[in-house]
Amino acid sequence: MKFKQDFFTQLPEFYSQVYPQGITKPEWLAWSDDAAQLIGLSQPTDELLLGLSGNAAVDGATYYAQVYSGHQFGGYTPRLGDGRSIILGEAIGPNGAWDVALKGGGPTPYSRRGDGRAVMRSAVREFLVSEALHHLHVPTTRALAVIGSDLPVWRESQETAAITVRLARSHIRFGHFEFFCHSERGRADKLIQLLNFTITQHYPHLSCDAAGYKAWFLQVVQDTAKMIAHWQAVGFAHGVMNTDNMSILGDSFDFGPFAFLDTFQEDFICNHSDPEGRYAFGQQPGVGLWNLQRLAQALTPVIPSDDLIAILNQYQEALVQPYLRLMRAKLGLSAVDVPSVEQDKQDLDLIGRFTVLMEKNQLDYTQTWRQLGKLDPTSKHSALRDDFIDVSQFDTWYQAYQQRLGAVADIPAWQTERNSVNPKYILRNYLAQEAIIAVEEGNLAPLHLLQKILTQPFAEHAEHEDLAKRPPDWGQGLIMSCSS
């Protein structure tokens, strides 16, 4: 790897230098070939294993942990920071630079009495969801690898430590801006320094002046809205949408007790620590706006409040339009030639009625969309009909759907197109859990197979139909904790 060190050299007050503590008996548990290509790597090597497990220095790396704050479950925490993630720098790849971070690399000044470690189960989950989201075309950070060890760590019980090697276009979060506005009062100069760095590094088409700052914030609003639109379309619940877990670039970030929907449930909660459902699946669009409002508050020393409010008022449209585009593609609806508020409203109603029917009939979200690939949209008798208990309500919806769909000249091509946007395979929690149990038993094959399937989620993989099934009884409604 070849590194540059722009964050390290230009923002010295934004981090603490800290070196990783190596894990014992490191071994490759998983590796992403296409993530490796982003930073110019090919195959995992023994030398790389030693470096990324914290047991040897990586040439060109400067190790550091970033400081930031954030709103966690609605309350402001004035000092957070990377408690177990150590950044090596920005690795230069063929198409840009990516931060390389060792998540679980050991304690930092921000560990808050934690051990700075990640357990194997959380490392595997982060790796798999990074692969899954990327191949579902959802904006996300990436995971290069998972490195296992025999190092014991204690959570609710004894587990083994592991490291996720995370790649991110940037690790700058909403919480970075909050820290230098609220926690370090009177440091508007540092806020401006961070803003200028962010624009120069990631928005080089914008200027570092009043007009550029407003254009930048609008882009952040749009990117955040687009990310959440993708989450809602694929049925992904993040679980911990604190502002310190929000990437300034609109990439899915900091995965903990996440889940993909099995049975469709608007108020689905995937986080054991969120009994009131603040971050429930259906709440995510609203939380996205709330988090952007917190970011806007942090930017008031730099951008006038009236301008911030005007930009925030564009969030709803920035969310709805990509969501409509994604959902129209899932349903096979033709794109609207001339944008129309009325047509958007009608399509949102059609989509909403369909998901309400899914919830009422306790249907699997992913499987139901995939069934459209078997549908003859010209037939009065839908293959989907048998899945619904209240067929009269389905018939009413299906009639409206056919009317909106219009004529379909090439049915096989239409079906193929549906299968290209409606995945057959998602990272169901029970599949991740089965892979983790196998790793604990020394068997990496289920993990590697699951990774392979998740990199091709739209393919049939007829020999692996079992990975597309709804969860067994024990795997239904699994709720994960933040313990990792």
Curated annotation (Swiss-Prot):
The keyword Manganese applies. Its EC number is 2.7.7.-, 2.7.7.108. GO terms for molecular function: AMPylase activity; ATP binding; magnesium ion binding. Its cofactor is Mg(2+); Mn(2+). Keywords: ATP-binding, Magnesium, Manganese, Metal-binding, Nucleotide-binding, Nucleotidyltransferase, Transferase. Pfam families: SelO. ATP binds at residues 81, 83-84, 103, 115-116, 166, 173, 254. It catalyses: L-seryl-[protein] + ATP = 3-O-(5'-adenylyl)-L-seryl-[protein] + diphosphate; L-threonyl-[protein] + ATP = 3-O-(5'-adenylyl)-L-threonyl-[protein] + diphosphate; L-tyrosyl-[protein] + ATP = O-(5'-adenylyl)-L-tyrosyl-[protein] + diphosphate; L-histidyl-[protein] + UTP = N(tele)-(5'-uridylyl)-L-histidyl-[protein] + diphosphate. The active site is at 244 (proton acceptor). Mg(2+) binds at residues 245, 254. Belongs to the SELO family. NCBIfam families: PRK00029.1 (NF000658). Nucleotidyltransferase involved in the post-translational modification of proteins. It can catalyze the addition of adenosine monophosphate (AMP) or uridine monophosphate (UMP) to a protein, resulting in modifications known as AMPylation and UMPylation. This is Protein nucleotidyltransferase YdiU. It comes from Shewanella baltica (strain OS223). The lineage of its organism: Bacteria, Pseudomonadati, Pseudomonadota, Gammaproteobacteria, Alteromonadales.
